[in-house]
């Protein structure tokens, strides 16, 4: 069966996951993480894609981003990947691919799902420089990061929003919700309710949810 084209919608937030091959860590230290973030800032501007959250883990990268056009997300990830892998290989005197195949992504339904995706990234690591958590929690702002409308709606003042986000960070993302989001990302589907999935399918001209297993029912 032919592989479906990537599901991506202009103007919608997406959760993105890019995994390392496992043979070596994706980030060895703070210098590597700084190099990745530098490449990310350059690609954001070049590809007109807003980044809302990031997490740089030893074996994977998590992003939440909104592309201005359907192809912007892929261009962003590919641009960052090329720049970073080149710098990584030079610095560590190694060669070859760093990533395990294609990146994975899911279109996010506006509303609570976008906030869950932010928490999926911000909550992945509390270490400075490992995620964008500080940007929303009263710490140093990361240049170029934009908060989505869902975050702005949490409170009327920056202090109120930051306090609410710190509380959410402390509670963490419900495990079942995190598993649901990751399944959508790994499958390349929509993370949303059935009605939003129907709209996404129509907009992208491809399925947005996995088909039921087994043969179609006879009519």
Regions found by a protein language model. Name each.
Residues 1-57, 66-219:
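Short Pro-Cys-Gly-centered "Cys-loop" motif that presents a nucleophilic cysteine in a tight turn
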Residues 62:
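Conserved G/P- and acidic residue-centered "switch" motifs that form tight phosphate/ATP-binding loops
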């Amino acid at each position: 069966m032919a592989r479906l084209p990537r599901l991506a919608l202009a103007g919608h937030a997406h959760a993105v996951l890019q995994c390392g091959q496992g043979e070596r860590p994706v980030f060895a230290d703070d210098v590597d993480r700084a190099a990745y973030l530098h490449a990310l800032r350059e690609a954001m501007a070049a590809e007109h894609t807003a980044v809302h959250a990031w997490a740089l883990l030893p074996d994977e990268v998590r992003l939440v981003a909104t592309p201005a056009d359907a192809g912007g997300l892929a261009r962003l990830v590919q641009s960052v990947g090329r720049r970073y892998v080149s710098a990584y290989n030079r610095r560590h005197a190694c060669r070859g691919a760093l990533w395990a195949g294609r990146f994975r992504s899911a279109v996010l339904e506006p509303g609570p799902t976008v906030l869950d995706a932010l928490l999926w990234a911000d909550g992945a690591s509390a270490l400075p420089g490992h995620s964008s958590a500080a940007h929303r929690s009263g710490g140093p702002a990361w240049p170029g990061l934009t908060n989505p409308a869902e975050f702005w709606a949490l409170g009327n003042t920056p202090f109120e929003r930051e306090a609410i986000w710190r509380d959410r960070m402390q509670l963490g993302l419900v495990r079942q919700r995190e598993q649901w989001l990751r399944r959508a990302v790994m499958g390349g589907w929509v993370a949303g309710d059935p009605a939003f999935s129907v709209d996404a399918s129509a907009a992208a001209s491809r399925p947005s949810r996995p088909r039921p297993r087994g043969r179609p029912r006879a009519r």
